[in-house]
Amino acid sequence: MKAELIKKEGNKVTLKITVDNNKFEAAVNKAYNKSRNKYNIPGFRKGKAPRIVIETQYGKGIFYNDAIEILFPEVYPEAIKELDIDPIDNPDLDIEEISKDNGLVMVLNVEVKPEFELGNYKGIEIAKVENTVSDENVDAKLQEMVEKNARLVSVEDKALEDGDTAIIDFEGFENGVAFDGGKGENYNLVIGSNTFIPGFEEQLVGKKAGEEVEVNVTFPEEYHSQDLAGKPVVFNVKINDVKVKELSALDDEFAKDTSEFDSLDELKADVRAKLEEEAKNRADAETRNSVVEKVAENTEIEIPEVMIQHQIDNMLNELNYQLQYQGFGLQQLLEMTGRTMEELREERKEDAKKLVKSSLVLEAITKAEGIEATEEEFKAELEKMASAYNMEVEKIEASLRDADKEDIKGQIKIRKTIDLLVDNATIA
């Protein structure tokens, strides 16, 4: 295989890859063996026709495309490594020549990462992030624990108010006709939670168990169901029960019942320690983000549009993954908010551009400083993964592809690079 850099303009390059005829012929034979069962040739059993017979009937190049598909994943990575180029998108491929003399000659046009001059990245000044935990923070966390461990108890003859839970049956009608998804039984509705359509919960305030209420509301214009968006509807609601939270006293008994501690003082100390650790981690993360952001601001880069679009793809894939845990996806989000996919992508463009720029700058600093991931650091990362997945380190390592291992080492290098930036920053 021979690789040549033909032309470079900005971040667009043209390269030529030549594969000698022997190697190409071997790939053509592989393609023939892989697909010969597809051809029915008179006088031959299916799959038994010689290659030359199939080529005579269908054309000499019948197996060329498959042969190129076999060769490309092997020769393309070799070529870009040899030429030291870093593609950011799939290449446009043209076949220049296929001959016995020259073999397979491919010309590829591809966008690569932009070249740029690093700005100053040492001695960056950033504001110190406070990570103190106050008594009020501790008290709020303890109260949160009390709320979380509260019991719901029924109260007779209690008029509903904010914070109460109504156990209701309901059915919705639009123009007198029941609509899909508008019916429920023994539903726990917290008054004031804004779980239902705007105006629904307010009409239950002051009502008691056993009462039946006619609730008139209008669905929001941006409601995800187009059939109901903006439509006035009526819900027939029966209040089966009214429940209120019964809060435990914040004392030693509470500590014993809800934790491994025997006293409230011990529980408080543990809560404070955990809050302080969270605050420190949060402050460290904010500091690291601030340093990276400042360093990126010091460097001018013309970000290729394709890199921005790929980053937006990643961001939306992550968003979709998170939404699926809540029982819906991107399409439902768009319907609920009345936005198009194009608008959603445009909203994320600026953040995507910043992320790409930061990534390019960190990679460049890593290279400039000669930062590498040691074998010990790699093994330590595998041990963390093994602990997280409750697996043996050897099994984790055996399951990783070479590309996965390089990704892990890349993450280690970037982490060390950010450590270097923070260590050299002025934090005041």
From Swiss-Prot:
It is found in: Cytoplasm. GO terms for cellular component: cytoplasm. It holds the Pfam family FKBP_C. It comes from the Bacteria. It catalyses: [protein]-peptidylproline (omega=180) = [protein]-peptidylproline (omega=0). InterPro entries: PPIase_dom_sf, PPIase_FKBP_dom, Trig_fac, Trigger_fac_C, Trigger_fac_C_sf, Trigger_fac_ribosome-bd_bac, Trigger_fac_ribosome-bd_sf, Trigger_fact/SurA_dom_sf. Residues 163-248 form the PPIase FKBP-type domain. One of its GO terms (biological process) is protein transport. The keyword Isomerase applies. Involved in protein export. Acts as a chaperone by maintaining the newly synthesized protein in an open conformation. Functions as a peptidyl-prolyl cis-trans isomerase. PANTHER family: TRIGGER FACTOR CHAPERONE AND PEPTIDYL-PROLYL CIS/TRANS ISOMERASE, TRIGGER FACTOR-LIKE PROTEIN TIG, CHLOROPLASTIC. This is Trigger factor. It comes from Clostridioides difficile (strain 630) (Peptoclostridium difficile). The gene is tig.
